[in-house]
């Protein structure tokens, strides 16, 4: 890749429902293409930078030179990425399924031994 970017991340989503649909599924994972696109747009070959980073102008200059794709976020790191993705996906899943399905958690992996989980605490 020709762009400066961070490390590889993995994402795990856990969905929950009080009852299964007519196919005996919690959620049809074939409907997850919009989630994949969101993850690619925000995390694939991107440079995630905290919106308050004092060097933001430097990062933007790299982007202007075609050296990076900068994604501004309110905090960075696996913990914040898990929270950020959860807050994007959860309401859409709830709306898409007429509140039948809830996003229970998002886990973000840095590599095999490190991860952070953001949990839905509304249903605990």
Task: List PLM regions with ranges.
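Charge-rich, low-complexity N-terminal segments
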Residues: 1-124
